[in-house]
UniProtKB/Swiss-Prot annotation:
Signal peptide: 1-19
Record keywords, A-Z: Coiled coil, Signal
Coiled-coil regions, chain positions: 20-66
UniProt feature, compositional bias: Low complexity: 63-75
Region Disordered: start-end pairs: 50-81
Annotated family: Belongs to the UPF0422 family.
Stated name of the protein: UPF0422 protein lpg2959
Organism: Legionella pneumophila subsp. pneumophila (strain Philadelphia 1 / ATCC 33152 / DSM 7513)
Domain of life: Bacteria
Length: 530
């Protein structure tokens, strides 16, 4: 009897619970029925749209089949009739994998518009210099091609560091593929002058120093560089356009990471770090004509990891001259300074164990069978000369819109008289320059003027003037261009002075004689840079 009472009590208590559960189930069933009705309505609408689309497509196909073929010639359009171009704008999206690129071994990326691939972005990116696309210079001076030829490896290493720092700043992964930068220039020029040894005015129009540069940043530590230059010098025989050829101007590999170490290594064909040769003129300074040396060295260098601070390098290469040991070496030291963002500059000096490999020593530009043509001349020279030591001291300072450049370079021992002579004695050639410049705005365009004084000593055999006064006006009328006009006044060595240089075995060159005269030259140049 007790059990019956307990069972009846439980039944009475559980009946409300079952009633609540039944009510919840009924509500859930009604909600699902409403959702099913909505989905069925959407399905009916889509089926109707599909049927309309098929009907419209069949109608267009029937009209196209019934339309006669159009003649191949275009119909004549009445004058003034407007032709409406059909186009539309679409949103472009970048489609990239969610997985890290290293997991799939490449970087597949696509630009998508209207569910179609517009273009794929993959492989090695090729950009115009500078790498970052930062273009502060209207005149194109920030391009690779306009970086100084001396220590270009160091400046490219600094640019490479800025590139990879930019990747880190915006949170991009460091790419494991090369980044190739293209740069170049074309500088057509016209000159008018009255030379030392002629009473007639001479003129010329030439393409000038045109060049194409390729810099490939393989990673944070390694970069390769190649510069192909146009050879404007006339051939020994025939018209000068026959020598319109490109050759390797520079090419090297640089290994270094200034964020990790101030040490670096460079090997290839470069201008050795001896001298600075900075100038705003159209003409090359006499210091460059005398001592700039392009060869194939190995360079071990140090560069302060900050923008300012000390730098240095030691280098060695095989000499083109054949007398004595073939090895030549040198050292370069300097310091870059800056104060309050207004004053900046550089001071430095260098030593080289032989100046005989310099461009101005290897070729003087003399005609075949006349005066000394340089140690590298087949008809007017000889490489069997003694190696002669040289030194360089230079300084550059800029303040606000003004800049001053000073440099001296020269042999610190005399050549043998049979190698290079001046007034019958062994020559000790030297050169110096002083140049003052100022930048300003002209006709709402960036412009600059510069004046300079240059001199040489015992360099008559190298066809260099004794003194030079020079001035230039530069302006960038259009972006990435520099239009220049230069006036140059050269003074030759005296009438009583004479010089000569090494000749082929069994021959003697004609002596180079001073004229005591002056020469005036006007040059106009348009430089285009990219």
């Amino acid at each position: 009897m007790k059990f019956k009472k307990i069972i009846l009590a439980l039944a009475c208590l559980s009946s409300p619970l079952y009633a609540d559960q039944d009510q919840q189930l009924k509500s859930e069933i009604q909600r699902l029925q409403h959702q099913a009705e909505d989905l069925q309505a959407q399905l009916n609408r889509l089926q109707k749209q599909l049927a309309n689309h098929k009907s419209s497509q069949q109608k267009h196909e029937q009209q196209a089949a019934a339309k006669p073929a159009e003649p191949q010639s275009k119909p004549t359009v009445k004058s003034g009739a407007a032709i409406e171009e059909k186009y539309h704008s679409s949103k472009v999206e970048v489609h990239a994998p969610d997985a890290h690129p290293e997991s799939i071994s490449f970087y597949p990326t696509a630009l998508i518009a209207d569910n179609r691939v517009v273009t794929y972005i993959a492989g090695t990116p090729v950009v115009s210099s500078p790498f970052l696309g930062d273009r502060p210079a209207f005149d194109g001076s920030d391009y690779i091609v306009n970086i100084s030829s001396i220590n270009r490896d160091v400046r490219l290493m600094q640019q490479r560091r800025r590139l990879y720092r930019a990747y880190q700043k915006i949170g991009y992964p460091i790419p494991n593929m090369p980044i190739i930068s293209l740069s170049g220039k074309a500088e057509p020029a016209a000159t008018f002058n009255n030379p030392f040894r002629s009473t007639n005015t001479d003129g010329d129009i030439t393409l000038g120093s045109s060049e194409l540069d390729v810099a490939a940043a393989l990673n944070e530590n390694v970069e390769a560089y190649i510069a192909i230059a146009y050879d404007e010098s006339p051939p020994a025989i025939g018209p000068r356009v026959n020598n319109s050829a490109f050759n390797l101007n520079m090419g090297f590999v640089n290994i270094g990471n200034l964020d990790k170490s101030p040490l670096y290594f460079t090997a290839g064909q470069v201008y050795v770090p001896f001298g600075r040769y900075s100038s705003a003129m159209v003409s090359s300074p006499v210091t460059m004509n005398l001592a700039r040396t392009k060869t194939r060295p190995v360079i071990f260098g140090y560069k302060s990891q900050a923008d300012t601070g000390p730098f240095g390098a030691v280098y060695g290469y095989r000499s083109d001259t054949t007398l004595g040991r073939s090895g030549v070496g040198g050292v370069n030291l300097g310091y870059i300074f800056g104060f309050d963002n207004d004053i900046n500059g550089e001071v430095g000096g260098g030593f080289i164990s032989s100046i005989a490999d310099a461009g101005g020593m290897q070729s003087t530009g003399a005609n075949v069978g006349t005066t000394f043509g340089g140690f590298g001349s087949i008809t007017n020279g000889n490489e069997n000369v003694r190696k002669t030591k040289a030194a360089d001291v230079h300084g550059h300072v800029g303040y606000d819109r003004y800049n001053l450049t000073l440099e001296w370079v020269g042999a610190i021992q005399s050549f043998r008289p049979q190698d290079l002579s001046f007034n019958g004695q062994g020559a000790r050639p030297q050169a110096a320059q002083a140049e003052l410049g100022m930048t300003f705005m002209a006709f709402n365009r960036p412009a600059s003027i510069g004046v300079g004084y240059q001199w040489t000593k015992e360099a008559l055999a190298l066809n260099l003037p004794k003194r030079r006064y020079v001035g230039v006006f530069n302006i960038s009328i259009w972006k990435d261009t520099v239009e220049s006009i230069e006036y140059r006044h050269d003074i030759d060595y005296g009438l009583t002075q004479f010089a000569n240089g090494a000749a082929p075995q069994g021959f003697v060159n004609l002596p180079t004689l001073g004229t005591g005269k002056s020469a005036d030259t006007v040059s106009a140049q348009i430089g285009v840079y990219f």
